[in-house]
From Swiss-Prot:
Sites where the protein binds heme: 256, 316
Subunit structure, as described in the record: Interacts with CtaB.
Record's keyword terms, sorted: Cell membrane, Heme biosynthesis, Iron, Membrane, Metal-binding, Oxidoreductase, Transmembrane, Transmembrane helix
Name of the molecule in the record: Heme A synthase
Source organism per UniProt: Rickettsia akari (strain Hartford)
GO cellular component: plasma membrane
Pfam families, sorted: COX15-CtaA
Recorded coiled-coil stretches: none
Length: 337
């Protein structure tokens, strides 16, 4: 009963975090992220209802750079569309925190979760608090002189969400999954190492993907596998090792492409390691990994070739989380055997 309660709670929390990541990505891709120019964690829980309140929100938006530089002449109806998308993103964030923290308090005082097991849940709670601040810190960067958010703040905002998901998902499978029964003579060192490496490179790739989104780097060099006619674009070829490149969309797209090759290579090696063990559950994970990897790569290529269609780009982001989840599951099973 205790495990069942925790499992259901963690499952819902994981789904909510995934929804937050996907809707956050859509908010970024549609340019809706700067439509709400205030941070009101408590009083901002309700949207405008009257015509006058909508006009007031629109007037606030007009006072900031994005309206004058990007959306000048936007109608109130058009403003409502981007406002409501950002509002849903923020509302979902509040709901996610409530869905996480209320049961956590209950479980703690009812001794459903033991004191010795509380650390990861407390870390996740602290990260939720940091995430709320980071979201506003990111938005604030686009309300100053430039009508675009800092791509670094955007990337950290995403990575914090992924770390929260990682913690919750690991606790979920820890409560839900049985330990693998593998003969003691079976060598699991190599798949354990490569699953750890795979998790690391996917984290890096997710971070780079956020930089690509923040710089609109997916809207240039819409060709594959070459960037135009070159493997290394001419803009960065003669000045590759320069910190200024971290603000260059061409360089960031190039590094993200390299990251995708790294993910492909590491995951394929991991799949081979899992298949050589000849264990039914690990073999099943290997097949899931290949499907998720192929989906992730194909949606990434389509996103690039067609200049970032929102639906495909969102699916691409979702499969990054799915791929990471499968590898976390794999790592847990091997590490616990």
């Amino acid at each position: 009963m205790r495990k069942s309660l925790i499992t259901k709670w963690l499952f819902v929390s994981c789904i909510m975090v995934i929804a937050m990541v996907v809707i956050g990505g859509i908010t970024r891709l549609t340019g809706a992220g700067l439509s709400i120019v205030e941070w009101r964690p408590v009083t901002g829980i309700l949207p405008p209802f009257s015509f006058e309140s909508w006009q007031a929100e629109f007037a606030k938006y007009k006072a900031f750079p994005e309206y004058n530089s990007v959306n000048y002449g936007m109608t109130l109806s058009e403003f409502k569309c981007i406002y409501l998308l950002e509002f849903i993103h923020r509302l979902l964030g509040r709901m996610t925190v409530l869905i996480y923290i209320v049961p956590l308090i209950y479980f703690y005082f009812k001794d459903v979760i033991k004191n010795c097991d509380m650390l990861p849940y407390i870390i996740a709670l602290l990260l939720f608090c940091v995430q709320g601040f980071m979201g506003w810190y990111m938005v604030k960067s686009g309300l100053l002189n430039s009508p675009s958010v800092s791509h670094f703040r955007l990337a950290f905002h995403l990575i914090i969400a992924v770390i929260i998901y990682h913690i919750l998902f690991y606790q979920l499978i820890k409560n839900r999954c049985d330990i693998l029964l593998i003969p003691s003579q079976t060598d699991l060192k190599l798949p354990l190492i490569f699953s750890g490496i795979a998790i690391t490179v996917i984290y890096v790739q997710i971070f780079l993907g956020a930089l690509v989104a923040g710089l609109d780097a997916g809207l240039i060099y819409n060709s594959f596998p070459l960037m135009g006619d070159h493997c290394i674009p001419m803009e960065i070829k003669d000045n590759f090792f320069n910190l200024a490149n971290l603000h260059d969309p061409v360089f960031i797209q190039f590094i993200h492409r390299l990251g995708s090759y790294s993910v492909f290579l590491v995951v394929v090696v991991l799949v081979i390691c899992l298949l050589t063990i000849e264990h039914p559950k690990l073999n099943k994970i290997a097949y899931f990994l290949m499907i998720a990897l192929l989906m992730q790569i194909s949606t990434g290529i389509i996103t690039l070739l067609y200049s970032v269609p929102i639906i495909i780009a969102s699916i691409h982001q979702l499969f990054a989380i799915i791929l990471l989840s499968i590898i976390i599951w794999c790592y847990f099973l091997i590490n616990s055997s």
